[in-house]
Amino acid sequence: MNRATPPPDLPMRPSQLPLPDAHTLPNGVRVLTLPDRRAPVVEFRLVLPFAGRAYDDPDWVGLASATARLMSAGTPTRTSFEIADEADRYGGSIGVSANTETATLTARCLSAYLEPMTRLIADVLLHPTFPPDEVAIDRANTLQRLRLQRSQPGFLAEERFRVALFGAHPYARLAPDENALQRWGADELQAFHAARYRPAEATLLAAGDFDPDALLPLLGDALAEWQGAAVAEPVPAPPMQTAETGWQLVPRPNSVQSHLMLGALCPPRNAPDSLALQLAVSLLGSGASSRLFLTVREQYGYAYSVGAHLDYYLRVGAFVAEAQTATENTHDAVRQIRAEVERLINEPIPTDELQATQNYMIGRHMLGRITLGGVADLYKQAVIYGLPLDYWQRYPDMLASLTAQQAQAAAAQHLQPDRFAVVVVGEPSLGEASV
């Protein structure tokens, strides 16, 4: 036995992901049903396409996130504690969150409590009262969280990096400032909810232990009063060119290390070469066998933590390489990250490295499908990013069929280092260097 050589990968066993069936409620809500009787649990994901952070008024940044968080803070018939207690009695939970473009109501329950859970979902969705005392508590908690975040170099780097990518576009907003949080209260939360939480173009996914013929009438009755046309056009698409390229220093005196973020805009998730680009970026910077890990960390010791990934928005993507490094290694780390991107573009990708990355990505995808909630989240992503419903069913085969040339071509098209924004949070003395 040679312990220096890892055992060969086992062959991938076929695993067919079921497709949901599509229905439409009388009020126009699209419902995707995915029955799965293996466990007595039901998962819900309700995606609302025009209620995310990008729809904040510039003077009221943070309103969309607060609206989502506080929808479960009280209704005319339930307090926040009663909502949480009732969901707990049903063996589940309920909450609402906002991302960049969309808001999502997430709920789960034991299938024995499906009917009362649909009523609880409807109450939280349709009748939030935004009690002033709960709003005040949320504001205080948010202020405390913001003050903590602004002491952390990773947050400061991402905040500046968003501006470098998107300029004045709403996607650049990462978090509110303290003054913005004081400008709105319960009335503004109610107005945002009334304007943005509409059934038109909303999609509700239900996965788990239920009979669709029984569930659909329950949902139709519970959501019957939810009416309203589409509220607005989607947020304008951002320019496809990175707003500010080159070195950008965020001074943080007395820092013993620097936080680096490098990257540029790239096509959205539903672009034709998106999967090839995901493969290239995973090979570059995902996991302990990626090129950035093996060179920047293992070979040169410039950083303990280093990696690369793609962030996706509705109509654009962003390539991000990130590292934390000692101040004296800052410029060397940036140069080495750029060098690895150049190598990815210019040198052929070895077959074994390509296959190892494909296996890694397929394996992570399969792990995400183990739980019912994971399957529900996959289809939620398909809804948010405009992917075909069979995308995740085809994903392993599509990924396995990609060639090294396709991955390299996507990298060459979208990852040109001279177009990168380079954001560094660290010592003011770092300045700009030739990197």
Write out the residue ranges for each language-model feature.
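Charge-rich, well-structured scaffold segments of protease-associated domains
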Residues: 1-8, 24, 82-232, 299-435
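N- or domain-start disorder-to-order transition segments that initiate the globular core
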Residues: 2-42
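Residues that act as N-cap/strand-start positions at coil-to-secondary-structure junctions
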Residues: 15-17, 88, 244
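His/Glu-based metal-binding/catalytic segments typifying zinc-dependent metallopeptidases
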Residues: 29, 34-52, 61-63, 231-290, ...
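Solvent-exposed coil/turn segments that connect beta secondary-structure elements
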Residues: 36-38, 49-51, 75-76, 110-112, ...
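M16/MPP (pitrilysin/insulinase) zinc-metallopeptidase core fold and M16-derived inactive scaffolds
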Residues: 43-108, 151, 286-302, 313
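Structural motif
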Residues: 57-58, 149-155, 269-275
